[in-house]
From Swiss-Prot:
Lineage of origin: Bacteria, Pseudomonadati, Pseudomonadota, Alphaproteobacteria, Rickettsiales
InterPro entries on file: GTP-CH-I_C/QueF, GTP-CH-I_N, GTP_CycHdrlase_I, GTP_CycHdrlase_I_CS, GTP_CycHdrlase_I_dom
UniProt cross-references to Gene3D superfamilies, sorted A to Z: 1.10.286.10, 3.30.1130.10
GO BP, sorted A to Z: one-carbon metabolic process; tetrahydrobiopterin biosynthetic process; tetrahydrofolate biosynthetic process
Protein name per Swiss-Prot or TrEMBL: GTP cyclohydrolase 1
SUPFAM superfamilies for this protein: Tetrahydrobiopterin biosynthesis enzymes-like (SSF55620)
Keyword GTP-binding among UniProt keywords: yes
Protein's gene: folE
The species this protein was found in: Rickettsia massiliae (strain Mtu5)
UniProt record similarity statement: Belongs to the GTP cyclohydrolase I family.
One GO cellular component, as annotated: cytoplasm
């Protein structure tokens, strides 16, 4: 599949404006196709980014702690079904084996996956598996809590529904004690 030109993308925006009953040649909408294309370039900038490069800077130290947890990483993504936003928080825990990464690296990988068309379930797995694959910890736990515009702006019109997804690897998947501790910590907010 070849990537459309910028002009083809702008024409697609004009077509959508006509589809909803608007006149793309009216004053307020003249620059909208450019703005949409620029916005999409930023919003969907997660494509082509390499998570392994982000998690490549590791600190190899004797770990004097059992596990590492980063709570409340805020994100906004777009559902691949309706191209409507969903936003929420990501909680990530891992039990290091012999290395750790700076906390900003975890927030960066959340942003990489959030800046793609997504479904929350897949994003949860992608974050957990990328940490597992690149850091090789004893286990990883990821929880995403999000509100979906596709439920609040259309269809069932439920604006207070929060979807929670979790994915576990290693000792979090194998030992209930670790899952229980993670869920207790993430619930206390």
């Amino acid at each position: 599949m070849s990537k459309p030109t910028r002009e083809e993308a702008k024409e697609a925006v004009r077509t959508l404006l006509k589809f909803i009953g608007e006149d793309p040649s009216r004053e307020g909408l003249l620059k909208t196709p450019d703005r949409v294309i620029n916005s999409y370039a930023e919003i969907f900038s997660g494509y082509g980014k390499d998570v392994a490069k982000i998690l490549n800077t590791k600190f190899y130290e004797t770990c004097n702690f059992q596990d590492f947890i980063l709570l409340n990483i805020k994100f906004t993504s777009f559902c691949e079904h309706h191209i409507l936003p969903f936003n929420g928080t990501v909680d990530i825990a891992y039990v290091p084996d012999n290395c750790i990464v700076g906390i900003s690296k975890l927030a960066r990988i959340v942003n990489i996956f959030a800046r793609r068309l997504q479904i929350q379930e897949k994003m949860t797995v992608q974050i957990a598996e990328s940490v597992q694959e690149n850091l090789k910890p004893l286990g990883v736990a990821v929880k995403i809590s999000a509100v979906h515009s596709c439920m609040s702006m259309r269809g069932v019109m439920q604006d207070n529904s929060v979807m929670n997804t979790m994915h576990y690897t290693g000792i979090f998947a194998e030992q209930q004690k670790y899952r229980h501790e993670f869920l207790n910590l993430t619930a206390k907010r």
